[in-house]
């Protein structure tokens, strides 16, 4: 599995023979100026909620690549109305796609679409096939619902957790989240993009290490091979 960090909460993941794009937000992110979204080959987009910093490039990329977006019902309807192929899910549901199974799980956050319309409930995704499994938390606070993931999904290879604080949980709560989901390899997201969510990398990584966890704080454009 190849994982490429495209900034903020956006990742390109090669999984199950398909190219997945998580929360597309590139053109509007000045930190990701080295990423050309027109170079991305995408089969599916997984969109956790409707905020612009998670869905900002979904229309452009969806129109160019004909990728299928996977999102909650309200976001799916909004995308379809703009000519994007999309599949609707909701919290607690799962579906087997041609790259693996996707389960939509709880996130504690807010959600409104860029035009001000209702974005429905925010969520996260657990994705798995016969050999690997990962959790995309989306924007969320620490929530006891995370304890359900090890009970209902395969053991996680890694998890993508927000840890910039202010708008999501900070790294201290992300450590607790990693314990509740029984995952030892965490890839951080939703940090350093804007001034309020800048973090101390050294302190965060040391805190994870003290908890017996590995934290990767990727640089934009970095590729991780698992």
What are these regions (language model features)?
Residues 1-2, 63-68, 132-134:
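Short active-site oxyanion
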Residues 1-19, 26-29, 96-103, 109, ...:
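Zn-dependent metallo-beta-lactamase
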Residues 12-51, 56-60, 74, 110-116, ...:
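Pre-active-site segment of Zn-dependent metallo-hydrolases
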Residues 56-113:
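Glycine/small-residue-rich loop that forms an oxyanion/phosphate-binding "nest" at active or ligand-binding sites
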Residues 68, 80-93, 175, 179-226:
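Binuclear metal-ion centers of metallo-dependent hydrolases, dominated by the metallo-beta-lactamase
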């Amino acid at each position: 599995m190849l994982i490429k960090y495209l900034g903020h909460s956006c990742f390109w993941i090669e999984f199950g023979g398909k190219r997945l794009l998580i929360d597309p937000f590139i053109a509007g992110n000045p930190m990701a100026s080295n990423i050309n979204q027109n170079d991305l080959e995408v089969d599916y987009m997984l969109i956790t909620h409707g905020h612009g910093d998670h869905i900002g490039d979904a229309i452009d990329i969806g129109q160019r690549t004909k990728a299928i977006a996977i999102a909650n019902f309200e976001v799916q309807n909004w995308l379809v109305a703009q000519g994007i192929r999309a599949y609707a899910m909701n919290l607690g549901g799962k579906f087997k796609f041609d790259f693996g199974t996707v389960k939509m799980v709880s996130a504690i956050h807010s959600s409104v679409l860029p035009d001000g319309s209702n974005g429905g409930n925010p969520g996260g995704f657990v994705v798995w096939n016969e050999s690997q499994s990962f959790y995309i938390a989306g924007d969320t606070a620490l929530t006891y619902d995370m304890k359900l993931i090890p009970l209902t999904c395969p053991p996680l290879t890694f998890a993508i957790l927000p840890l910039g604080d202010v708008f999501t949980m900070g790294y201290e709560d992300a450590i607790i989240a990693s314990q509740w989901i029984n995952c030892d390899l965490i890839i951080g997201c939703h940090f350093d993009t804007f001034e309020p969510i800048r973090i101390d990398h050294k302190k965060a990584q040391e805190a994870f290490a003290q908890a017996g966890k590995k934290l990767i704080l990727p640089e934009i454009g970095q590729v991780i091979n698992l």
